[in-house]
């Protein structure tokens, strides 16, 4: 089944952009980035910015990100995928990253949430951004929670 990504959550103040791959089924139903309760994205990011993002509504989460100059988007505009595994994404359409220069002129750092999105790191690096590939926030990745948490925290130290 072909799945559509979400529009970017960025503005002229965005300095850090986190790129995922493509929303999963639960996120699409909720129309929310990282909408699956088993995904640790909001817990990880909340611990980094010092806010309990897990316990507030989605709109307030996005506002907290903007206050902290953090944006969200996905590498893929659309793609076919059965279920939620990134390894099953096929026939993907890549987002137009060229719009970032105008939409987020202060963007400096692009973080990739997991291996699949990280495959596109060279494109953003070639555009002049500092880049880093992070361990995925997926709940399926919990066995490495400690190293994942420290890796995410380290990426935000600038």
Swiss-Prot record:
Q: What is its EC number?
A: 3.2.2.-
- One Pfam family cited in the UniProt record for this chain: UDG
Report keywords, A-Z. Answer: DNA damage, DNA repair, Hydrolase
Domain of life of the source: Archaea
Q: Which InterPro entries match?
A: Hypoxan-DNA_Glyclase (IPR026353), Uracil-DNA_glycosylase-like (IPR005122), Uracil-DNA_glycosylase-like_sf (IPR036895)
Molecular-function annotations in GO? hypoxanthine DNA N-glycosylase activity
* Record Gene3D superfamilies: Uracil-DNA glycosylase-like domain
UniProt family annotation: Belongs to the uracil-DNA glycosylase (UDG) superfamily. Type 6 (HDG) family.
- Main function: Excises hypoxanthine, a deamination product of adenine, from double-stranded DNA. Acts on double-stranded DNA containing G/I, T/I, A/I and C/I base pairs, but not on single-stranded inosine-containing DNA. Also has minor xanthine DNA glycosylase activity. Lacks any detectable uracil-DNA glycosylase activity.
Q: What is this protein called?
A: Hypoxanthine DNA glycosylase
Q: What is the lineage of its organism?
A: Archaea, Methanobacteriati, Methanobacteriota, Stenosarchaea group, Methanomicrobia
